Structure formats: structure tokens, C-alpha cells
Regions:
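Interdomain "pre-motor" coupling segment immediately N-terminal to P-loop NTPase/helicase cores
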Residues: 1-28
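Hydrophobic anchor at the beta1->P-loop junction of P-loop NTPases
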Residues: 63-65
Length: 189
């Protein structure tokens, strides 16, 4: 037995109305990953299923969708899975440190204090899949890196699963710089 919420029931009804009732079981049965506490992570929509499929098949994936559709969370799930399966040696999560025209100089504290609020969604997803202790141990060993996009300049990242979150906030120059960072054996989302 598994609890199914109203949004999933509505989605199943919509699929049935579109003549895709056979796809409902695929979504219900397909487990993408498990959290640190053993909770099953499943695709909630066909869009998520296509996204996961793209993440499994391709080295570069652009995830496009509204806020709250699981783009970052599922990418982190796949990154952790790739690390656990020894497909990559590192997980690197980054995002532009400035959003909506805000300037870091106006925020209190050192650089780490200034960028941490922007990186919090990435930490939250990592904690879900690794647990706090494991996350901190892997971070200390340099296996996991969560940093502002500006810190990627001049690097070549081999054998890494690299996630750029909130890419829509990048300038064209930042995006070009990011897309030239990944090296051999790396995957980019």
C-alpha cells in the first residue's frame, strides 16, 4: 500500500482522458531513487519521466519547467545515484549568486554567509539523499562541492556530475563560461 495524494489522482484522470491510461502504472511503479531515510522517489508526471530518461541517456541536459516541478531535486537524485554507482567521482552544484538584481555586497557577513542562502535549496536536496553526516563527510573530502557559479571560472571538471541551478538567472557570458567547464566523463544539467 502506498498513499496517493489528490494531485496524483487528478493527473491520472487527465492521462486517462487523453487516452494515456496505460502510462499511469508506469508512473506509479517506476522508482527513480531512495532518500537517505528510504522514501521512494517516483516521477509524478510524464514530464518528470522524460526528464529522468534524458538525465540517464545524455551528458548535457537542459531542464525547463515552472518552479516547483522537481528539476533540481531530481537532478540531485540522479547525481547522487551516479556517484554511488561510481559513474562519477564528484558532484558539483552551482548557481548564480545574484538573483533579481540583488548585490552580494549589501548582505552582512563574509562571502560564505552571503552565498549560503542562495545555495540552500541545493543543500536541502543533498541532505535528503545523503543525510547530514554523510553530506558533510563527502564535502570535507571534496567529493561534493556547492559553490557560486563565479567559482567555476578557469576550471576543467572531469568525472563530475555538475548541476547548474537557476540557470535562467545567468548572463550569456556566465552560461558560456559554465558550458566550457566540463571535461572528460562529466555530465551537466
Amino acid at each position: 500500500g502506498e498513499n496517493i495524494d489528490r494531485s496524483r489522482i487528478r493527473y491520472a484522470i487527465d492521462l486517462a482522458k487523453e487516452g494515456n491510461a496505460d502510462l499511469i502504472l508506469e508512473l506509479i511503479d517506476d522508482v527513480v531513487a531512495f532518500t537517505n531515510k528510504g522514501r521512494k522517489i517516483k516521477c509524478r508526471t510524464l514530464g518528470q519521466k522524460k526528464y529522468i530518461s534524458a538525465l540517464k541517456r545524455n551528458t548535457v541536459v537542459f531542464g525547463v519547467g515552472p518552479a516547483g516541478t522537481g528539476k533540481t531535486y531530481l537532478a540531485v537524485a540522479m547525481a547522487v545515484l551516479a556517484y554511488k554507482n561510481k559513474e562519477v567521482e564528484k558532484i558539483i552544484l552551482t548557481r548564480p549568486a545574484v538573483e533579481a538584481g540583488e548585490k552580494l555586497g549589501f548582505l552582512p557577513g563574509d562571502l560564505q554567509n552571503k552565498v549560503d542562502p542562495y545555495l540552500r535549496p541545493l543543500y536541502d536536496a543533498l541532505y535528503d539523499f545523503l543525510g547530514s553526516e554523510n553530506f558533510h563527510a563527502l564535502s570535507e573530502r571534496g567529493v561534493i562541492e556547492v559553490a557560486p557559479l563565479a567559482y567555476m571560472r578557469g576550471r576543467t571538471l572531469n568525472d563530475a556530475y555538475i548541476i547548474l541551478d537557476e540557470a535562467q538567472n545567468c548572463t550569456v557570458e556566465q552560461m558560456k563560461m559554465f558550458l566550457t567547464r566540463f571535461g572528460e566523463g562529466s555530465r551537466v544539467v
